[in-house]
Amino acid sequence: MLLFNAVVLSVLVMLILSVARVHVIISLFIASLVGGLVAGMGVSGTMVAFQDGLAGGAKIALSYALLGAFAMSVAHSGLPRLLANWIIKKLRNADESNSARVARSAKWGILGGVLVMGVMSQNLIPIHIAFIPLLVPPLIGVMNELKMDRRLVACAITFGIVTTYMFVPIGFGRIFLHDILYKNIEEAGMAVEGVVNPMVAMAIPAASMAVGCAIALLVSYRKPREYEQRETSFSSNDDKPVDMKKVWAAVLALVACFVSQAVLTKMDSEADPLLVGALVGLCMMLGMRVVPWQQADDVFSGGMKMMSLIGLIMITAQGYASVLKASGQIEPLVQQTSAMFNGSKALAAVIMLVVGLIITMGIGSSFSTLPIISAIYVPLCVTLNFSPMATVAIIGTAGALGDAGSPASDSTLGPTAGLNIDGQHDHMRDTVIPEFIHYNIPLLIGGWIAAMVL
């Protein structure tokens, strides 16, 4: 039975434990054991596969730790305080007739800013979620002042990230659409490169994401939400004037960090752009004396602590994904669901999308899901007479499903890292569940419509 498939059981255990407020690292570890044992790998085999996968997350964790240190050094420069104080001053100096308008402008300015940055992080400035710890934590005090529901910000960030790479074939979008999606479909025997425009094929799924984002921003989380104004490593009650020399030095370091990542990405360098960019930024901050040598250890340690939890979750998620792949239960899951089609294109599209959702929820990466499902989905689509464009829409959507809404995905971990700086933003309840509802459900519907009409 489908329910007794190791992958399905493992993902269900992970989700149930996470919703029950069991720590996500413990949830991933227990889910790994369940998946391995149900697949017949035994405790030893499961642990070996889990341990082998841990190394895959080490580089990411180190990159995020260094990025956290860089973010803290930027905060030390006074740049975030300058921005936050300017917004707060505008709010407090506004008279009663203008205060509501100023607050509304500030709220939508913040939301628009993080959304645009999310879009640019996938192409123009290809740094993925690296912008979040630099941009979001310094604005937490302003968000509290505005009584902004942080679920709004989480949804805005993730929309900018996920919709962009699944729709726009530039930067990370080129990797997702051409280097992975099209490449694997071609290898499975269907010609799509130069035949199918990815922006046309993925237009309906992308539009469904936009609908989900609009509902989140305009309906679900538009009401004010109270947060305590807590002291954090990014907040300061210091009334001393900001040193503008340090501010401009921080701006230069930020530009250098972004440019170095963009150049390495453009060159297809094997060096990790995120790691190199963080190192470049840190070196510039030290070299320009934004962070004095005698304070560097405390500043950098504080930043690394900020990102350490996210790094540990990413390492654990890699181990979990390794167990799922080693279980040998992913292909049987796809094959078992294929037998349920009975020649129905509508039913086939739904089942293929749901299976993609389950796999991505478990692995935590849409980029890793595509190679797994393409080899089996392409022959099925050919047999059921789906057009090449519909095939691209089905497989592309099946891969992207679950990225926004998986506890182990960087599309959810990134926003949590920035928004939980003061401990008032829960990963499952304030990021994962809202994004699952507002993005995965519309994306499932949009993917099915695309499969039927293209």
Residue ranges and their predicted role:
Residues 1-66, 201-319, 438-442, 446-454:
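Hydrophobic transmembrane alpha-helices of multi-pass small-molecule transporters
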Residues 1-7, 58, 129-131, 206-207, ...:
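Structural signature of hydrophobic alpha-helical transmembrane segments
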Residues 13-21, 117-126, 160-168, 260-264, ...:
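Transmembrane alpha-helix interface/packing and boundary motifs in multi-pass membrane proteins
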Residues 28-34, 153-160, 372-377, 395:
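Central hydrophobic cores of alpha-helical transmembrane segments
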Residues 43-144, 294-382:
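Membrane-embedded alpha-helical segments and adjacent helix-loop junctions characteristic
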Residues 69, 115-119, 138, 157-166, ...:
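Transmembrane helix-bundle signature of multi-pass membrane transporters/permeases
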Residues 98-121, 146-163, 188-198, 345-359, ...:
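Alpha-helical transmembrane segments of multi-pass membrane proteins
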Residues 140-241, 412-454:
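Membrane-core helix-loop-helix motifs of multi-pass transport proteins
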